[in-house]
Amino acid sequence: MTRYIFVTGGVVSSLGKGIASASLAAILEARGLKVTMLKLDPYINVDPGTMSPFQHGEVFVTHDGAETDLDLGHYERFIRTTMTQNNNFTTGRVYEHVLRKERRGDYLGATIQVIPHITDEIKRRIIKGAGDADVALVEIGGTVGDIESQPFLEAIRQLRVEVGSKRAMLMHLTLVPYIATAGETKTKPTQHSVKELRSIGLQPDVLICRSDHPVDVSSRRKIALFTNVEERAVISLEDVDTIYKIPAVLHAQGLDDFVVERFGLQCNGADLSEWEKVVDAKLNPEHEVTIAMVGKYMELLDAYKSLIEAMSHAGITNRTKVNLRYIDSEDIENQGTALLEGVDAILVPGGFGLRGVEGKITAVQYARENKVPYLGICLGMQVAVIEFARNVLGWKDANSTEFDRASGHPVVGLITEWEDATGAVEVRTEASDLGGTMRLGAQECLLEAGSKVHDCYGKDVIVERHRHRYEVNNNLLPQIIEAGLKISGRSSDAALVEVVEAPDHPWFVACQFHPEFTSTPRDGHPLFSGFVKAALAQHQKKA
């Protein structure tokens, strides 16, 4: 039977519940347990798919095509379990389902209330998402005390009672601030946060004390006394120089032993050797490169969370320190390509909307003409095709219909029909809703032998995740190919362009899919690894 660890946060937001939860999950997995994770988001949106990157950060796409919270990216990077649409749900999705049932008459005329109807649906989804895992860690978004979180907290209170204390525990993250003038950490915010939890019937079993300084034994003893938590279960988690140290930090304080004993699980000791290798490669690089990342959401780098981590993983794989130079594409429009000078490679990620697109196209032109290694992702592939059409074919009005519907050479256009991962045909028009209407999830891609992308993957067929509604226009493709642009990857039915490569260039690859969603610190990703190798070769050539 599945054991549940419910994870909440208090005092302030952004304490790192997702990373702390994923780190504990990684230790339990290293002990031979089957682990999964869920994220419960209190906002009213059905999913984050249409939310601004500046508000929400990255939208992480699962293998089965769900648009989810970026924490699911942390989960997949720390454990081997593949997340699905069942691993993330929101208040909006819960209410949508309950209201649909009410409209069908499933409740037989009952008055629909938060308790029991909404809380029952939350519990049902938690149990379904946990599946047959030995341990399921369930993270509740937001901060204890928020109005939005109350139905979720009530649901886990009920579920703890229903499954019993041997199968459910509560882990609470809290802030223990260090006051420099006093030279000590303060426990009062933690005491008040736990008091808030207890007022709604939830007693934490574990406290993770986040701080920029070690939380000393005296402070931990005081916290244990006033919160009714065992002293051994009050864990100090200070800031670290790489998040991949955290499993070892939690293991050293016996957190996994406490969990295993509490649940009565029989399992092996934790083998963290893989994480030790990751940390060693991260902190002891043998080489160094600088890569320009040209995007449009640079004010909130969480919008590119998986991509930034994927570049870090590629550095780990190549024993190379990867310095990312974050460049707003609008700055290139205003200041020119001087911002790109001296870099070893250029990366253009995905995005939506007209703003900053011309700056991205300029960055592509700089990379192509100056033989600088280039990797384009999603929109980064589309602007590569636009740049090639404008500056090689001479189609000066070439564009995407996303940005200019009147373009005389719409080399990129809306996908109106395609097959999804199940083989079902999806149809879209300009009038379709924005939410949940993109080409989403894992799709097969056929690679051309002898291409650079084939050299990276070392296989003929790959599976990568997608999130886009525009594609290269097949009607103009023959002229583009004739001018020299190489199509090195196509969809499984050969109908859609998935990867392009520039001719006469040391390393210029652009893909329609999002390889960052499947990169992990232990395994890296072949495309990013190949990109960093190309950047390293460029750096050594300049030296």
From Swiss-Prot:
L-glutamine binds at residues 351, 379-382, 402, 469. The active site is at residues 378, 514, 516. Pathway: Pyrimidine metabolism; CTP biosynthesis via de novo pathway; CTP from UDP: step 2/2. One of its GO terms (biological process) is pyrimidine nucleobase biosynthetic process. It comes from the Bacteria. One of its GO terms (cellular component) is cytosol. One of its GO terms (molecular function) is glutaminase activity. CTP binds at residues 13, 146-148, 186-191, 222. The keyword Nucleotide-binding applies. The keyword Thylakoid does not apply. Pfam families: CTP_synth_N, GATase. It catalyses: UTP + L-glutamine + ATP + H2O = CTP + L-glutamate + ADP + phosphate + 2 H(+); L-glutamine + H2O = L-glutamate + NH4(+); UTP + NH4(+) + ATP = CTP + ADP + phosphate + 2 H(+). Keywords: ATP-binding, Glutamine amidotransferase, Ligase, Magnesium, Metal-binding, Nucleotide-binding, Pyrimidine biosynthesis. Transmembrane segments: none annotated. Residues 290-541 form the Glutamine amidotransferase type-1 domain. Allosterically activated by GTP, when glutamine is the substrate; GTP has no effect on the reaction when ammonia is the substrate. The allosteric effector GTP functions by stabilizing the protein conformation that binds the tetrahedral intermediate(s) formed during glutamine hydrolysis. Inhibited by the product CTP, via allosteric rather than competitive inhibition. UTP binds at residues 13, 186-191, 222. Belongs to the CTP synthase family. Homotetramer. This is CTP synthase. It comes from Pseudomonas fluorescens (strain Pf0-1). The gene is pyrG.
